[in-house]
A protein has these predicted regions:
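Core dinuclear metal-dependent hydrolase active-site scaffold
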Residues: 35-62
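Short active-site segment of divalent metal-dependent hydrolases/proteases
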Residues: 5, 57, 74, 79, ...
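Conserved beta-strand hairpin/beta-sheet module of binuclear metal-dependent hydrolase folds
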Residues: 60-70, 74-75
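Active-site neighborhood of phospho(di)ester-bond hydrolases with catalytic His/Asp-centered motifs
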Residues: 1-2, 50-53, 68-70, 106-111
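Active-site HxH/HxHxD metal-binding segment of metal-dependent hydrolases
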Residues: 1-40, 44, 122-130
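Active-site-flanking alpha-helical
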Residues: 9, 60-61, 78, 118
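Divalent-metal (often Zn2+) His-rich catalytic cores of metallo-beta-lactamase-fold enzymes
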Residues: 56, 66, 90-136
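Short glycine-enriched, charge-decorated loop/helix-capping segments at active-site entrances
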Residues: 16-19, 79-85
Length: 136
C-alpha cells in the first residue's frame, strides 16, 4: 500500500456503512509501495507508479507489456474523482503521466475490458487536452 492511502483505509469502515456494504478489516500492509519500486509476482516484475487522483495513494503496476491500472484508466473512461479524498487535478496529472507510456501496453483496469495506452490516447474523450498526440 502507498502511504498516502492511509487516510483512505482509515475511513473504509465509515464508507462501508455509507454505501451499505460489509467491511472486514484487512491485515496491516506488509510493505509500503513508492514511486519506482519493483514488485515481483509469479516470476514477473512490475514497476510501481504513484498515480493519485481517484485516491491519494493510488498506484499502477507496469511491466511485461501490461499496465495493471486499478481505477485510473478504463476503456473509454477514467476513474471517478467525485469521491471523498479524490483529487481531480491530481487525476489529470496522473493521466498525463500514464499516457507517456508506450502505445502498445495493454491496460487491465480494475474492472471492465482491457484496452491499450495508444487506443485510449487516441479515442478516450476524458483524455482530450491531457494526453500528448498519438504517435504515427
Amino acid at each position: 500500500m502507498h502511504p498516502a492511502d492511509t487516510p483512505t483505509l482509515a475511513r473504509a469502515p465509515q464508507a462501508a456503512i455509507q454505501y451499505g456494504v460489509e467491511f472486514e478489516t484487512p491485515p496491516a500492509p506488509d510493505r509500503e509501495l513508492a514511486e519506482g519500486d519493483s514488485l515481483s509476482v509469479g516470476g514477473l516484475t512490475f514497476s510501481v507508479m504513484h498515480v493519485p487522483g481517484h485516491a491519494p495513494g493510488h498506484v499502477v503496476f507496469h511491466g511485461n507489456g501490461v499496465v495493471l491500472g486499478g481505477d485510473l484508466l478504463f476503456a473509454g473512461s477514467i476513474g471517478r474523482t467525485d469521491l471523498p479524498l479524490a483529487d481531480p487535478r491530481a487525476m489529470e496529472e496522473s493521466l498525463a503521466r500514464i499516457c507517456e507510456l508506450d502505445d502498445d501496453l495493454v491496460v487491465y483496469p480494475g474492472h471492465g475490458p482491457a484496452t491499450t495506452i495508444g487506443r485510449e490516447r487516441a479515442a478516450n474523450p476524458f483524455l482530450l487536452g491531457v494526453a500528448r498526440p498519438v504517435r504515427r
